[in-house]
């Protein structure tokens, strides 16, 4: 349980997601009951007892073996009561240092107190590290445990997964993905009719905790399943929605489209044989919206993917396996976050029964329905077990090995990474797979009628260019309304992006990261949907700011301001090799240029460009 603040102790007790490291208990895939059970893998925890430390005054040291180069949380285990000085706990591990109050605390089933720091430790390499803790507190043990976003599996499926991932089919699909660079994400469903408002109350004003994005309507208002289902009776979008959206994606310069075939609410936009809670059987539309959009996208020369919430299903997925996970976590004193789980009106079946009867079959249905499907974008993996995650991946591969699977299938079985919702990784981060950032055009994924905080075209282009320069893809979201119409402010920004991309496409499609991502501009990380909503966008750009991509013998320097005067690109100095030719993409005019020890000097006199910027192509 969570503990209230004690006198003299600066604890910021917060409800944050923190789950134990789980794996499937049974090898019998057909055994629905045992597939819901799981056991903890505390063998992946590093436990350092106080009695084993080398003590020097109030300093305690251990030698620590890091076997997995991932992100860890640091916890301190106290016996019974807190010490008055327990806020003064300093931890040093290798080059890392933690000097802050604890972020959360809880009691174990043995009545011990576990306190955890908010700061995490990211180890990039395996090996030995020295850990030192300096404190006068009467602690019992130090725990170094994998952060909940970095579960460590048993490894028993790794070789089989790797063989599939490295297959010619998967690698060809990844080559396509790396070249595509820019895709459209679509969050659309029953919730789109409500526009983020339920019975006159805006979702932002909901009294319940949890995300306030429009597609979480059912969760935000704890709407009973049968009541929420009534929305299906009025869901009747315009028949032109598919062609309109496909054309918008094409005009925006996007190469692929990914739509929510089933979000957390459990409603399917396709004609499912496994459930009648779908577009054909439950709505007056009486047609397969996924198939229609798929065909419209193919007609526009676009590739197609589907989002599928496999872990969360508020209609048929009971409590999302919450009770089983919580039982294990309670025994370890680990808080189990209920966010995203239906605890107000769960279906009477087990979560494993939902997987067997609905989720696994629907994945196979989608792949068979869409022969040229490019990828499945899984979501809601929080309490999915290692065995279940692998089964989803293998099911996709066995049905069509050309279909890519994203990271959120769970347990690191994805073919590529996603950086997180509206998150762009640092240029210094080392990622072991190709990656993608998904982002919004305002502050919601689904249609929120009152959210007019639209990102400007310049802001969206900045995110896109920043992502490309770091070697990733950008999956940019739209949220159509209940009729399938895209808000004009959102569509306008996408079309303006498309006009810029059309001129500068040589610097975009098929490019890779250059030796450095940018110059002139200090890195400002986009750190989540809520972060952008709260902080806004205040960045400005000058003629000294450039982002780089490369392809073959060419380096592209991308500017986000109009072409004017003379520019100096420092990173293209003589140290990079001899530049043989320079041109401005989209212009037929020759430019005067000179490569020096200081950089590449280019005169832009007489060059016309978009107000959103230009691209210098340097051929080596």
Where do the model's predicted regions map?
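Bacterial lipoprotein signal-peptidase II cleavage site
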Residues: 25-30
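A short, amphipathic alpha-helical segment
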Residues: 1-2, 617
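C-terminal motif of bacterial Sec signal peptides marking the signal peptidase cleavage site
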Residues: 20-23
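Bacterial N-terminal signal peptides that target proteins for export
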Residues: 2-12
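Hydrophobic helical h-region of N-terminal Sec-dependent signal peptides
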Residues: 13-18
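Mature catalytic domains of secreted/periplasmic carbohydrate-active enzymes
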Residues: 31-620
């Amino acid at each position: 349980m969570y503990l209230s603040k004690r006198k003299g102790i600066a604890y910021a007790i917060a409800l944050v997601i923190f789950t134990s490291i789980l794996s499937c208990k049974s090898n019998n895939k057909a055994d629905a009951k045992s597939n819901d059970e799981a056991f903890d893998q505390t063998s992946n925890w590093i436990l350092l007892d106080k009695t084993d430390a080398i003590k020097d005054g109030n300093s305690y040291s251990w030698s620590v073996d890091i076997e997995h180069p991932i992100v860890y949380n640091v916890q301190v285990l106290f016996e019974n009561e807190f010490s008055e000085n327990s806020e003064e706990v300093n931890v040093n591990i290798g080059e890392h240092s933690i000097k802050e109050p604890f972020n959360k605390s809880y009691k174990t089933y043995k009545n011990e107190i576990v306190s955890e720091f908010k700061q995490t430790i990211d180890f990039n390499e395996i090996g030995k590290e020295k850990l030192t803790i300096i404190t006068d507190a009467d602690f019992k043990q130090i725990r170094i445990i994998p952060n909940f976003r970095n579960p460590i599996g048993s490894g028993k499926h790794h070789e089989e997964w790797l063989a599939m991932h490295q297959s010619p089919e998967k690698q060809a699909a990844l080559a396509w993905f790396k070249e595509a660079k820019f895709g459209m994400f679509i969050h659309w469903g029953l919730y789109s009719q409500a526009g983020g408002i339920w019975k006159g109350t805006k979702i932002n004003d909901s009294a319940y905790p949890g995300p306030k994005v429009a597609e979480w309507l059912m969760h935000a208002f704890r709407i009973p399943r049968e009541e929420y289902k009534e929305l299906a009776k009025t869901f009747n979008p315009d028949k032109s929605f598919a062609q309109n959206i496909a054309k918008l994606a094409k005009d925006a310069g996007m190469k692929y489209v990914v739509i929510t075939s089933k979000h957390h609410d459990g409603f399917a936009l396709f004609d499912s044989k496994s459930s009648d809670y779908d577009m054909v059987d439950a709505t007056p539309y009486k047609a397969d919206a996924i198939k229609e959009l798929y065909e419209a996208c193919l007609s526009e020369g676009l590739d197609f993917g589907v989002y599928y919430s496999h872990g969360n299903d508020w209609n048929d997925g009971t409590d999302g396996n919450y009770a089983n996970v919580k039982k294990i976590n309670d025994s370890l004193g680990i808080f189990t976050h209920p966010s995203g789980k239906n605890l107000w009106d769960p279906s009477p079946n087990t979560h494993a029964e939902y997987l067997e009867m609905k989720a696994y079959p629907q994945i196979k249905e989608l792949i068979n329905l869409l022969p040229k499907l490019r990828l499945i974008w899984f979501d809601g993996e929080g309490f999915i077990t290692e065995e279940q995650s692998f089964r989803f991946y293998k099911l996709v591969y066995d049905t069509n090995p050309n279909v890519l699977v994203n990271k959120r299938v769970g347990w690191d079985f994805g073919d590529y990474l996603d950086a997180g919702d509206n998150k762009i990784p640092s240029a210094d981060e080392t990622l072991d797979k190709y990656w993608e950032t998904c982002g919004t055009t305002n502050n919601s994924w689904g249609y929120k009628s009152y959210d007019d905080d639209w990102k400007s075209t310049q802001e969206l282009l900045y995110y896109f260019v920043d992502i490309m320069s770091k070697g990733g893809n950008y999956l940019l979201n739209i949220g159509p309304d209940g009729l399938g119409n895209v808000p004009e402010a959102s569509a306008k920004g996408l079309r303006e992006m498309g006009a810029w991309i059309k001129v500068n496409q040589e610097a975009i499609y098929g490019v890779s990261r250059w030796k450095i991502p940018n110059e002139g501009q200090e890195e400002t990380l986009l750190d989540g949907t809520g972060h952008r909503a709260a902080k806004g966008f205040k960045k400005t750009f000058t003629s000294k700011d450039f982002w780089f991509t490369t392809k073959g013998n060419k380096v592209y320097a991308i500017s986000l301001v109009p072409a004017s005067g003379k520019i100096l690109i420092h990173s293209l100095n003589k140290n990079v090799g001899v530049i043989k030719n320079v041109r401005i993409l989209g212009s037929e005019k020759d430019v005067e240029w000179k490569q020096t020890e200081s950089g590449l000097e280019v005169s832009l006199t007489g060059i016309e460009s978009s107000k959103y910027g230009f691209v210098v192509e340097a051929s080596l």
